[in-house]
């Protein structure tokens, strides 16, 4: 990114309408400067200050065997500031303060060898949710952002070519594979064959229980669910469920 309000990078894209998702594996990426961004992106327009949701990784040149983080960057308003990893955000705690969702390092590299990292970025309404995975099967939620965008937007691959402040013409590159873009979805309803859960198996006494549903590619999560505590079906006010992100929180005093 050129600065917080103006984008300047390489973007390969296509136009999509309404709900959509992009899934891909980042096979490899070069690192020519600190915090070079590589990943997938939804944009409302091709203007430099467009509203944006971008899922990717930030590499650190001095320690390029691993990623510093896999994170969800966003620009909520046209020509507003983008929440992006930079030199001043040098820890997960600082990223959290800046409102940047991230996950700890995945196994993108083993020494000099690339293992690759999978990305899944989903738009459902005005909610954009990012997931990352080592194998493309078991997904970790990176985070979600609510961004009001038009019905027709762009989706594609974003690579910050970047360049260190020297005379060398050395630019960043990236290789993607296993690319899938979906614009049509099948509702899962109660067909559990297309749903997986992640999160803790239990909660400590007196604390809320949290977990998450993830739908297979090309499927939408159900609009509503029922949860049992013991033999009883909980009333909806006893738990929260977000059909756009799959997040479930059961209140501690309703657990048995």
List the predicted regions and their residue ranges.
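A short, Gly/Thr-enriched small/hydrophobic beta-strand-prone motif that recurs across taxa
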Residues: 186-190
């Amino acid at each position: 990114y050129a600065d917080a309000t103006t984008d300047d990078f390489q973007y390969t894209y296509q136009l999509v309408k309404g709900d959509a998702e992009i899934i891909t594996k980042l096979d490899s990426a070069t690192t020519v400067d600190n915090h070079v961004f590589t990943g997938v992106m939804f944009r409302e327009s091709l203007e430099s200050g467009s509203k944006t949701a971008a899922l990717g990784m930030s590499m650190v040149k001095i320690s390029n065997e691993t990623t510093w983080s896999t994170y969800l960057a966003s620009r909520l308003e046209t020509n507003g500031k983008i929440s992006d990893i930079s030199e001043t955000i040098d820890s997960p705690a600082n990223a959290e303060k800046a409102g940047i969702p991230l996950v700890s390092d995945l196994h993108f590299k083993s020494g000099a060898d690339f293992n690759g990292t999978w990305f899944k970025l989903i738009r459902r309404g005005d909610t954009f949710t990012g997931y990352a995975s080592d194998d493309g099967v078991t997904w970790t939620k990176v985070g979600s952002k609510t961004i009001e965008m038009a019905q027709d937007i762009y989706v594609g691959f974003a690579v910050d070519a970047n360049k260190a402040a020297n005379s060398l013409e050395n630019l960043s590159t990236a290789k993607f594979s296993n690319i899938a873009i979906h614009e049509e979805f099948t509702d899962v309803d109660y067909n559990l064959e297309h749903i997986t859960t992640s999160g803790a198996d239990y909660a400590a006494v007196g604390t809320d229980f949290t977990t998450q549903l993830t739908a297979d590619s090309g499927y939408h999560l159900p609009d509503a669910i029922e949860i049992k505590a013991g033999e009883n079906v909980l009333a909806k006010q006893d738990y929260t469920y977000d059909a756009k992100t799959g997040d479930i929180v059961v209140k501690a005093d309703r657990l048995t």
